[in-house]
Amino acid sequence: MSEKQINNFSLISRLFGNLFYRFPTDKVLADAFVWLQQEGLSQVWALDTDKESELALNSLQVKIDLNLLNEEYQKLFATNGKVMTAISAYGIDVEEFVNFRLVRNMPEVESADHFALLLLTASWLEDNSDSLVAQQEFFETFLLPCAAKFLTQVENQATLPFYRALALLTREILATMADELEEE
């Protein structure tokens, strides 16, 4: 993986983590949606694309009614949503995850039991940790086991293309980064 791809991994992980974590109408995401509609993701997406991933990129970057997307978000990820966002629901030990973060002096969070925090942690590690072992441990212990189950749920339950596309592209970037970590 080139240096550009690695840097883009951090950016994309942070973006995707926030898209899974925040309501689409959250003001924090306003600039992210503008950037997506300007095809910013296509400009930083360094992975090879096939027809399916091109369609997914387009689905994330098309102008969308944020209120409609907010309804989909509620249906999928709200407290009684169809997709469990809690990493503990996928067999991840939250206390072990919190300790992993503490050992690496990562910022404290109110609740670590959310899938999006795994993507945000991956981004933080990419930007702030020189430890290949830490990244490998994080992927093997926390991110990949949870992501496989969570993303499948999103793909199966989403009715709008946006979240199905987000799940597919998340899977692609994680697979590429996992392969890179395995090679090193």
Swiss-Prot record:
It comes from the Bacteria. GO terms for cellular component: cytoplasm. Gene3D superfamilies: TorD-like (1.10.3480.10). One of its GO terms (biological process) is protein maturation. Transmembrane segments: none annotated. InterPro entries: DmsD-type, TorD-like_sf, TorD/DmsD_chaperones. Belongs to the TorD/DmsD family. This is Uncharacterized protein HI_1543.
